[in-house]
Amino acid sequence: MASTTPITMEDLQKALEAQSRALRAELAAGASQLRRPRPPRQRDSSTSGDDSGRDSGGPRRRRGNRGRGQRKDWSKAPPPPEERQESRSQTPAPKPPRAPPQPPQPPRMQTGRGGTAPRPELGPPTNPFQAAVARGLRPPLHDPDTEAPTEACVTSWLWSEGEGAVFYRVDLHFTNLGTPPLDEDGRWDPALMYNPCGPEPPAHVVRAYNQPAGDVRGIWGKGERTYAEQDFRVGGTRWHRLLRMPVRGLDGDSAPLPPHTTERIETRSARHPWRIRFGAPQVFLAGLLLAAVAVGTARAGLQPRTDIAAPPAPPQAPRAHGKHYGHHHHQLPFLGHDGHHGGTLRVGQHHRNASDVLPGHWLQGSWGCYNLSDWHQGTHICHTKHMDFWCVEHDRPPPVTPTPLTTAANSTTAATPATTPAPCHAGLNDSCGGFLSGCGPMRLRHGADTRCGRLICGLSTTAQYPPTRFGCTMRWGLPPWELVVLTARPEDGWTCRGVPAHPGTRCPELVSPMGHATCSPASALWLATANALSLDHALAAVVLLVPWVLIFMLCRRACRRRGAAAALTAVVLQGYNPPAYGEEAFTYLCTAPGCATQTPVPVRLAGVRFESKIVDGGCFAPWDLEATGACICEIPTDVSCEGLGAWVPAAPCARIWNGTQRACTLWAVNAYSSGGYAQLASYFNPGGSYYKQYHPTACDVEPAFGHSDAACWGFPTDTVMSVFALASYVQHPDKTVRVKFHTETRTVWQLSVAGVSCNVTTEHPFCNTPHGQLEVQVPPDPGDLVEYIMNYTGNQQSRWGLGSPNCHGPDWASPVCQRHSPDCSRLVGATPERPRLRLVDADDPLLRTAPGPGEVWVTPVIGSQARKCGLHIRAGPYGHATVEMPEWIHAHTTSDPWHPPGPLGLKFKTVRPVALPRALAPPRNVRVTGCYQCGTPALVEGLAPGGGNCHLTVNGEDVGAFPPGKFVTAALLNTPPPYQVSCGGESDRASARVIDPAAQSFTGVVYGTHTTAVSETRQTWAEWAAAHWWQLTLGAICALLLAGLLACCAKCLYYLRGAIAPR
C-alpha cells in the first residue's frame, strides 16, 4: 500500500539518486552488450517502445547511457555524426504490417516510497498515436508508425496530496522524429509534446499531466538535466508536477526551439574542461574597474570627505564684533560645553531644562533668551539675519531712571545713555544703556519670558574661532587612512569616539551634529555616488555597474556551459510560462470606452450607459474661505482696501472686507525708524493703540520683531517692512451647489465581440456569439445616488454620493437633508468663526507642516529687485463644525460613482485552444489625478504595453489588469507621489497631480497664494549654466564628436592629395 506521507523535494532527490545508482550498476554489467549494434526490432502496438522479447510485467528497465561515468548521455543528445551516417547508409529493414490490438499492459510507473501505483482503468488498446487521437488532439505531421529513438525517452514526475502522496513516474518523449514543429500560434504541438513511451497511464493521471498551468514554483537541476516544478489543482485536488525541459533538438537539426530554451554553445577549454574562456571585453571591463577603483582611492586619499546629514553650522558673525572677543573669551558658553544643552536655565521666575528653552537652529519654535545663572549675570542668544550672536552681561546694577534709547545712524553703532545702564531683564518699557549693538531685536520663546527686554543689553561677545580643517594621513606610511584635525572650532561639535576633537587629534572617523567625516576610500566612493555631478560620481557609477556586467557575463557563460540557460532565463527574466491550451480563456478589459483586448477574438468596450430616475433636490451656496494680503517696504498710514490698492487685488480685497467675521492684521517688521524720525518699540505694541493714535485703521496692529526683513533688500539696516493680511469666510457669487437624487440606477456595458454588438448588465452578463460564449464579470450597480453639481468661477464639476442619506440619523446636518431654494440664494449653515492669521518667517521649521483648521499663514517672499517683495499665503481646512461645506462634499462623495475600482473580467469559452501571454514592459504616459489617503479613488490613465495583459501596480499596490492600449481606471492611493508604475517587470515613473487630505477642499479656497509681480528678473551666466548643464554637456560631447569627424575628413583629404599628386 502506498504511504500517506506527503512527498518532498528531498525525497525526490533521494529517489533519483537511488535509481541512478541502480542504473549505473545495471549499465556496468551490460556495457559490452551496449557497444554492439542492435538488430532491427519488430514494433509492438501495445508496448510502443519496449523490446519484443521483454516481459512488460516485470520491473521497468531504463534505456540509454545515463550513468555519471559516461561521457555521452544518449537520453537527451543525438548520436555522433559518424554513427548517424552509418545508420543512414544501412538498408532499412522492411516494415512489417501493423499488429492487431493486444490487451493493455500495466503502466510502467512506480511510487517514490516503494509502493505500487494503482492499476489503470481498463479501456481500449492504444498506442501513442491512438492515445493522442483519443484525447482530441490532431495526429503528428510525421508517420506515427515510425520507431521513436530510444534516447528520446525522458522521465517526468507527478504526485498528488489527494492520492495519499503517491509518487508517479511518467516516461515520455517530446517527439517521435526529432524537433517538433511549431503550431500556428508559435507553440509546440501538444500531440508531440506528450507521447508516452509505454502504455497509457491512468485517466486521472493523464488529465493531471495535461492540465495547463502557467506558473512555475522553481527550477531544479539533476546532473545536466533541468526540471520545472509546477503546482496546480485539478477538480479540487492539488497536484505537483516536475517537467523535464528539453535542451536541444533530438535529431541534431536546426529546427526552431521552444520559447523557453536557448542555443547551447560550448565554452569549455579542451585542456581544462572546468575552465571558462574569457575574451577581450571581459579583460577590458576588469581593467576599467581596477582603474576606476585606483583613481577613486587616490582622490579619496587627497582630502577627507564629509557627509552632511544635518543643517550646516551657523554663519560667522561680522568682523566688526571681533574686537570684543578678547574681553570675555574665557566666559563664553560654546556648543558642546557642559551646562549648555544639559543645564538648567532660568526663564522669568521658573527654572527649565536647557533643551526646552534653548533657541537656535537645533530647536523648533520662536527665538528667545535664557540665563545660565541668576539675574546678575545674563547670557543671551539672538538670531537675526540668519546669524547667531552671544551677548553676555556681568553684574549690572538695577536701573535708576529709565532713559529713552537713542539710535545712531546704522545698526553697528549706538549712543551711550547718560545714566547707569539697566540689566537686561528690566521691564519692557525700561531702556538698557551702555550696550554695543550687534544683538538687535529678538522675539520671545515662552509667555513667561517677560523679564527679557525687546533689545538685548550687554557686550557683543561673538567668538571667532578659525574654521575647522581636516587632513588625511597614514600610519607609518601604510594604509588605512586616518583623519587628522588641523584646526578645530568648538561650536562645530566634532567628536572622536565621544571625545571632543582638538587640533592634532587622529581618528578613523569624526562625528558631529552636521554629519560624518572620514578618509576611508570605500566611504569616499560611497559618498561620491550620493553627491552632485562630479568626477567622483562618474567613478562611482563605473565601480557600481562594471561588477554587475562581469557577473552577468560569468553567469551567462557558466549557465550555458551547464545547459541551464533555460532555467536561468526562466527564473531571472520573465518566469517559465508553458503553453496553456484549453477550452476557456480569461482576461481583463479596462472600463474606459474604446478599450479593446483579445480573448482570443477581439473584444471592445463601445460605451457605458448610466440609467436612473432623477428627482431635483434644490440648490444652495456654500461658505468659502478667502485670503489676500501684501508685503510693503514701508509702514502704510491707511490700512484698508482703498489705502493699499497699489499692493492688494481690488476685487477679493473688497469681497473679504465686506464679509462677516473677518480677520485683518498689519505686522510691523523690525521697525526702528521711518522717515528719519525715532520711534520706540512701544509704538507697535500688541493691539497697536499707540500706532492707531496717528494712523486710524480697522485692522489689528502687531509687532514682528526678529523676523527677517530681507524681503525688502537694498536698504540700510534701519529700514522697516510691513505685512498686511486679510481673510474671512464669504459667500462667493459664482459658487453654487445643486443637488439631484438618482434612484433605480443601472449600468449598461456596450461590448463589441468580433464585430457583434451586445449589452451586458448585472441581470444578464452573457454574450452569445458565433465564436463562443462570453461571460463578463460585471461590477455591481451603485444603487441610489446623490449628485452634487458644483459650479465655481465658470467651471462645473459633479460629485456623487453613494446611497440615500439618513436625515433622521447622523446625516441630519448634511446638505442633502436641508431645504434648498431653486435659485441658489440660500446660504447653508451658520456663520463660521473668524479665521486666525499668523506671520511665519521663511526659515521657520513650522513651514514643513500644514496649516491647522481655520489658520492662514503668510510668509514674505524676497523679490529680485530692491523695494519689491511678495507674499505667500497658505490656508488650512475649515475650522468650524458645520458640515455644509465643500470639504464635507469631497469627503463624502466621489467623482465617478459607476466607475468600478478594477477592470472587467472576461471569460471566453471556445472550442479552439487559446494562449494568453502577459506583458512585462512598463506602461507609458501614465497620469495620476486626484488625492491620496482621502477615501476617494484617484484617476489613473495611460497606455498599456503590447505583448499581453498588463497587471498594473502603482507603488507596489495592485490596481488591475488591462489589455494593450489606452486604459482608464480609478484606484485608492495610500502613498504620496512620486508613483512608480509597473506591469510586473520594469517600472517607470508616472506624472501626478494629487493633493493631500489637508488640501482637499473646494476649488479656489484661497484666493491669496499670490506673489506681488516683479517687473523683471535677472539671471547671471553662472545661474543659466547651472540650469542648463545637461544641454551644455551634450553640446560639448557633440562638439568633440564633430571635431573628431572633421579631423578624419582632413586626414582622408591629406592622403587623397598625396595619392593624386605624389611628390
Curated annotation (Swiss-Prot):
Pfam family, one: Rubella_Capsid
The UniProt record lists the keyword Phosphoprotein: yes
Biased composition (Basic residues): 59-69
Region (Human C1QBP/SF2P32-binding): 30-69
Domain of life: Viruses
Bias (Basic and acidic residues): 70-87
Entry annotated with the keyword Hydrolase: no
Protein name, as recorded: Structural polyprotein
